[in-house]
Amino acid sequence: MKLLIFSCLVTLALARPDALRLSIDRHFKHRELENRLNEDPIPVSEASSSEESVHQLNRDRRPLEKYELDKYREDLKTSSSEEFVTPSTNERVRRQVEYNFNEEDSSASRERKIEDFSEHDRQYLRRRVEERALNLRYLEPLYYATEPEYYYYYAYVPVSSHDIPYQQKPLSLLPAKSHYLISTGLLNEPLPILRERLGRGFQSPSLLILVLTENSNLFMGSVFYWCLQIAHPMQEI
């Protein structure tokens, strides 16, 4: 048993040598404090007027823990009293000037942020409009009919007659009706719907023919209907 206790102490000394040293130092401090308390107290008249001598005298007369607690309380009272000291006139003016300066700076920065956000929104809306116009310019030829498609699909059309039921005639020999396109609203028709309606018109006795003129610089500009009525009056497509 003694060997076990001795081995534990040796292990503790090797692992934590400061633990044994602290216990020894604490023992010496308590012994020194008891010796001082047993001595005769030093009269206050023998102490000097300096603050260090007063603290040293109090330290000799009172225990260490109580002295530290009292000193902490005195420091706390001193710091709290210093905080509640009324500032002078110059100090108040300086604080007011700093506050006004900070307030003006914050308001100016807030206005700059608002202007930056507004400019960002305007640029975003402007960019959206430009992108939409660009996309529309690229997508319109894909959705609406163009001049090469009309010439490719409607270069020759069948024409009904009393003698011959159907025959082929070139577009240059057919009369033009330019106002009919705008009146019927087929100028804005998409290409698939226009093909379907013209496909039904080719099978009817009354025939309407869609072509483009030579001066077609604008998109879907100068579009004409060529209509030919030989056996029946003109019918809607």
UniProtKB/Swiss-Prot annotation:
Signal sequence extent: 1-15
Reported tissue expression: Mammary gland specific. Secreted in milk.
InterPro entries recorded: Alpha-s1_casein
Region named Disordered: 39-60
Any one of the GO CC terms: extracellular space
Main location group: secreted
PTM annotation (Phosphoserine): residues: 79-81
Keywords: Milk protein, Phosphoprotein, Secreted, Signal
Residues that span the membrane, as ranges: none
Expression induction or repression: Maximal induction is dependent upon prolactin insulin and cortisol.
Gene Ontology BP, a term: response to dehydroepiandrosterone
Subcellular location(s) per record: Secreted
PANTHER family given in the database record: ALPHA-S1-CASEIN
Family: Belongs to the alpha-casein family.
Role: Important role in the capacity of milk to transport calcium phosphate.
Protein name: Alpha-S1-casein
Taxon lineage: Eukaryota, Metazoa, Chordata, Craniata, Vertebrata
